[in-house]
Amino acid sequence: MHRYVVIDAFASEPLQGNPVAVFFDCDDLSGERMQRMAREMNLSESTFVLRPQQDGDARIRIFTPVNELPFAGHPLLGTAIALGAETDKDRLFLETRMGTVPFALERQDGKVVACSMQQPIPTWEHFSRPAELLAALGLKGSTFPIEVYRNGPRHVFVGLESVAALSALHPDHRALCDFPDLAVNCFAGAGRHWRSRMFSPAYGVVEDAATGSAAGPLAIHLARHRQIPYGQQIEILQGVEIGRPSRMYARAEGAGERVSAVEVSGNGAAFAEGRAYL
């Protein structure tokens, strides 16, 4: 049997945020079995905790219902909060296929309620199919250059003129299936406060409640295009349109086209626990 918990990541109470199933002690499971278990859970991601291979506290494998990811934000944040309940450490180092990700844990009355992660610094480039993407989204243009960032997953960013326009968005999900290995992030806002929606049929997710791996790149995108200064933390509210409000906090350090650090943080709340009879 394998014990698991479900953590609602980027939420301060259950039934909000983005849920992730965290399975413990998974060294006996094959990748194929993990994939089938993730499909059975049918959450946007499930994680599997294994013994570390290097100097970390644990090695983490991340699966959507359809594929394995080298890195993802909300699953790792939820996993760090779940593992924090098993230890009195204030810092954790989780090994992923994108390297070891450090976490700082925040406790209240001994309980882990939030954490921050240092994310991999992404690469970025102009997106090669902007007209087709805009057509699939039902948009005529973007308020920012349409660029794609890679920090494991590939995130493309499209800016809208207002939060109202963002909320009214009804993309053609069948057309979005023509963009393999891509998460489509639409955003609007100003200053420290931003709203986001993410669509990714390619990753088995119609619409995501909270996309932690996109939060850092969005902070970089805004800083590169001089909408915020480097070093300023932004709040990203996501999941409102699907009834799962999620709050992510992101900050990028750097200057111009050089990024030196990316930090993403948020709360997490335990929703359920159980055992898989495998």
UniProtKB/Swiss-Prot annotation:
Q: State which Enzyme Commission number(s) the record gives.
A: 5.3.3.17
Which GO molecular function terms does the record list? isomerase activity; trans-2,3-dihydro-3-hydroxy-anthranilate isomerase activity
GO biological-process terms attached to the record: phenazine biosynthetic process
Q: Which Pfam families match?
A: PhzC-PhzF
**Record pathway:** Secondary metabolite biosynthesis; pyocyanine biosynthesis
Active site per database record: 45
One Gene Ontology term, aspect cellular component: cytoplasm
Q: Which reaction does it catalyse?
A: (5S,6S)-6-amino-5-hydroxycyclohexa-1,3-diene-1-carboxyate = (1R,6S)-6-amino-5-oxocyclohex-2-ene-1-carboxylate
Q: Which UniProt keywords apply?
A: Antibiotic biosynthesis, Isomerase
Q: Which PANTHER family match?
A: ANTISENSE-ENHANCING SEQUENCE 1 (PTHR13774:SF32), PHENAZINE BIOSYNTHESIS PROTEIN (PTHR13774)
Q: Which family does it belong to?
A: Belongs to the PhzF family.
Report the function annotation for this chain: Isomerase that catalyzes the condensation of two molecules of trans-2,3-dihydro-3-hydroxyanthranilic acid (DHHA) into the phenazine ring system. The final product is not yet known.
Q: This chain belongs to which protein, by name? A: Trans-2,3-dihydro-3-hydroxyanthranilate isomerase
